[in-house]
């Protein structure tokens, strides 16, 4: 049987997700970065390989149980996302002169019979409201909904102003002002493809549920007259029927055809509306002749235009905006600037190293070992394989902090990066010498318990501050590498579509 999941369901999911960041007991989310090593073909301990694409063309992340675990293997660090970093967004549509914009209609997709019997589509060919180009953002960062496009003409006059009434421009377009992107929203929630969407309280308060603004002519009809028999003129006080009250229109005739319909009294409470031919003919100054007109009364969204801009513009997208500032020095310096990253993740409710719910602003996700100053250690290089004598442990260097003699590393399930000669991932431990396989650098772990540069070492070793395999990874993005620097800031905008 035919069925759909409605846009209201999508909107409900988006609202629940957005609210989860700031409700009384919020869900905790972290943005994670990972994958310091290059993409390519990885060898497993059983001699089989896993293909993950190339540096310039990584594969699309898999949504398998295997990948759920793998994504933690090369995680580098994570930063907490707060409610102020979250906003509803919609696809960005800049106003451009010479463009013919679609109009808002309540009946896109619907099959309505008449002189023609086809589904209602937009001028652009879009078959749904939210696929149509019915709103724009101007250079002043004002957002307007297009109510009328002057019979599918090009827009040449950029709308301006913040009036709560319909704005008519010199090109005869009719616009409804919705909201303005604040300076903060422009900085945080405006990208090449998306823009923040909020409901303006003044516009919302002025909205009238079921009030009417537009009537579109589907078929102009013929032989209409005004009183006295003239075939050109205006018939006034034509009632609009339906479930609302008070709607009145005037009808303009040219050579017996209806060429314009203007709402003179908007009325209220309409969820459907009609202008009947009999009411046109019966109007006080009508001539009593004419037939064949088909007029579409455009019904506003629930609450009226501007009552809820987020829903009206299709805000079932949520943007998460996170800024990474160098090493995040003000947050314990958990983000390395000595290596690059190729993977972005969204992690829900992870645990810290102690197994409790994570709450810190940032979390290191790599392992670390404190190297003794004597004998003098060598200089390990990022991305090289490291081995430990005695244990046979294998890892891959993320960063060598020569100032504090801290070696940061990861251990994955693959050869040369975590799997040892027996095919196991063995933990580094004790005072056994660690050797870099490319640099030939050596270092002896300092097995004392201490805190150095905000890193807590127990018997010389520090586990990741973000407990691997805890929480849930909701989003994964593989991308070409992003090189980092201490004086560099990355602004990462994730857009989740519901």
Where are the regions a protein language model picked out?
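Tryptophan-rich substrate-binding surfaces of secreted polymer-degrading and adhesive proteins
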Residues: 1-209, 294-296, 304, 351-362, ...
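Conserved, function-critical positions that sit in or immediately flank catalytic
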Residues: 169-498
């Amino acid at each position: 049987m035919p069925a759909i999941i409605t846009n209201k369901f999508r909107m409900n999911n988006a609202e629940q997700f957005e609210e989860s960041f700031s409700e009384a007991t919020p869900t905790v989310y972290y943005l994670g970065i990972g994958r310091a090593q290059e993409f390519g073909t990885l060898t497993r301990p059983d001699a089989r390989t896993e293909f993950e694409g190339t540096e310039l063309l990584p594969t699309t992340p898999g949504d398998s149980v295997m990948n759920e675990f793998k994504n933690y293997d090369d995680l580098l660090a994570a930063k907490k996302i707060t409610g102020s970093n979250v906003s509803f967004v919609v696809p960005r549509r800049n106003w451009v002169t010479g463009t013919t914009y679609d109009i808002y209609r309540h009946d896109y997709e619907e099959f309505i019979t008449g002189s023609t019997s086809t589904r209602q589509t937009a001028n652009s060919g879009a078959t749904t409201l939210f696929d149509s180009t019915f709103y724009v953002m101007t250079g002043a960062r004002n957002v307007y909904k297009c109510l009328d496009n002057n019979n599918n003409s090009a827009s040449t006059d950029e709308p301006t102003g913040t009036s709560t009434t319909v704005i008519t421009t010199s090109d005869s377009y009719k616009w409804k002002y919705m909201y303005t992107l604040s300076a903060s929203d422009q900085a945080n929630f405006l990208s090449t493809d998306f823009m923040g969407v909020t409901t303006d309280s003044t516009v919302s308060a002025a909205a009238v549920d079921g009030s009417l603004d537009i009537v579109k002519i589907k078929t102009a009809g013929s032989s209409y007259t005004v009183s006295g028999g003239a075939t050109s003129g205006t018939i006034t006080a034509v009632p609009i029927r339906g479930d609302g009250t008070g709607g009145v229109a005037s009808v303009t005739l040219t050579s017996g055809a209806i060429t314009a319909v203007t709402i003179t009294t908007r009325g209220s409470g309409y969820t459907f509306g009609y202008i009947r031919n009999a009411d046109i003919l019966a109007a006080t100054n009508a001539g009593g002749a004419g037939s064949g007109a088909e007029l579409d009364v455009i019904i506003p969204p629930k609450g009226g235009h501007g009552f809820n801009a987020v829903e009206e513009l299709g805000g079932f997208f949520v943007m998460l905006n996170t800024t990474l500032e160098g090493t995040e020095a003000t947050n314990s310096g958990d983000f390395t600037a000595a290596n690059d990253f190729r993977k972005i993740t969204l992690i829900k409710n992870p645990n810290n190293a102690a197994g409790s719910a994570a709450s810190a602003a940032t979390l290191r996700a790599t392992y670390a070992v404190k190297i003794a100053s004597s004998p003098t250690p060598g200089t390990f290089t990022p991305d090289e394989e490291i081995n430990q004598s005695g244990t046979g442990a294998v890892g891959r260097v993320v960063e060598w902090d020569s100032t504090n003699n801290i070696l940061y590393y990861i251990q994955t399930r693959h050869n040369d990066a975590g799997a040892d000669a027996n095919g196991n991932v063995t933990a580094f431990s004790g005072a056994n010498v660690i050797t870099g396989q490319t640099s030939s650098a050596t270092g002896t772990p300092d097995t004392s318990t201490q805190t150095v540069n905000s890193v807590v070492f127990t018997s010389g070793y520090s586990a990741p501050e973000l407990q691997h395999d805890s929480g849930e990874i909701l989003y994964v993005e593989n991308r070409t590498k992003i090189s980092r620097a201490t004086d560099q800031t990355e602004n990462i905008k994730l857009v989740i579509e519901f």
